Amino acid sequence: MAFMSFINGFSTLFLVALLASSMMAAKGGNFYQDFDVTWGDHRAKIFNGGQLLSLSLDKTSGSGFRSKKEYLFGRIDMQLKLVAGNSAGTVTAYYLSSQGPTHDEIDFEFLGNLSGDPYIVHTNVFTQGKGNREQQFYLWFDPTRNFHTYSVVWNPRQIIFLIDNTPIRVFKNAESIGVPFPKNQPMRIYSSLWNADDWATRGGLVKTDWTKAPFTAYYRNFNAKTCSGACTESFGDGAWQSQELDAHSRRRLRWVQKNFMIYNYCTDLKRFPEGLPKECQRRSRFL
């Protein structure tokens, strides 16, 4: 499938300046300043003066990092170049999460595959410790040849997952019908590269080929426009936190979901024989 670049349509939704008293921006962030390596020893490396980070996985261990700061609402962008070649069995996770048994979490997970087969991007949203809201997509480009931008926009109304500024998923605030929404717990940014060959590729049928190790993923151009620590829901009229998708972005979202979605928990009647989750019963097409 040919890669198509759509960088302009969605960006206009997020250009309004953030309130200086409660917001912070990190443009082209420095990995030394913004993140800590949390595990993996020498398998996680920061170089190019803090502008590039790599995570590696070998048979002994994977590796990971997390942000120094916590955030509540905002837009997070990171460019990744995923594990090349036979990446079957590996998972590169990039997500936001709070801590504790009732944690909130917003997930991108990239499931490796055999050479020539497409990567799968696995998304999930946890609220108050409960997940089971998976949607999965094939990527419509080779994510190992070049860097691509993976973004989360999180505001009191919705969570938007984007790839190269194209929305692939929207999780709307459905508190009005009793569905918890992540809005009170600040989250850190995490990423890790690890072995998950018990489930990641074809349900665990394809195992990691350790003769191809080490497996390496690369990160650059971290950018955050977020609340740090605490933030109110009132951002002022016209602020980006209250924006909705425009018509072009809705078309792009429908295009992705029609052509590349391979799993949607909101249509899995076998998994939920007693009824789909409440948010799936709403008429919105963009859950």
From Swiss-Prot:
Glycosyltransferase as UniProt keyword: yes
Broad class of where this protein is predominantly found: secreted
Organ and tissue specificity: Expressed in fruit pulp. Expressed in leaves, flowers, calyces, stems and fruits. Highest expression in leaves and lowest in fruits.
Catalysed reactions, as listed in the record: breaks a beta-(1->4) bond in the backbone of a xyloglucan and transfers the xyloglucanyl segment on to O-4 of the non-reducing terminal glucose residue of an acceptor, which can be a xyloglucan or an oligosaccharide of xyloglucan
Keyword check for Iron: no
One of the GO biological process terms: fruit ripening
Keyword vocabulary terms for this entry: Apoplast, Cell wall, Cell wall biogenesis/degradation, Disulfide bond, Fruit ripening, Glycoprotein, Glycosidase, Glycosyltransferase, Hydrolase, Secreted, Signal, Transferase
Stated induction or repression of this protein's expression: In fruits, expression is decreased by gibberellic acid (GA3) or 1-methylcyclopropene (1-MCP) at the beginning of storage (until day 6). Expression in harvested fruits is increased by low (0 degrees Celsius) temperature treatment, particularly at the end of storage (day 32).
Top EC group: transferase
Chain residues that bind xyloglucan: E109, H122, T123, N124, N132, R133, E134, D198, W199, G203, R271
Pfam families tied to this protein: Glyco_hydro_16 (PF00722), XET_C (PF06955)
Function description: Catalyzes xyloglucan endotransglycosylation (XET). Cleaves and religates xyloglucan polymers. Does not catalyze xyloglucan endohydrolysis (XEH). Overexpression in Arabidopsis transgenic plants results in elevated tolerance to abiotic stress, such as salt, ABA (abscisic acid) and drought stresses, and in the production of wider leaves. Overexpression in transgenic tomato plants slows down fruit ripening and softening, and the plants produce larger fruits. Both transgenic plants have larger and more irregular cells.
Name of this chain's protein: Xyloglucan endotransglucosylase protein 1
Gene that produces this protein: XTH1
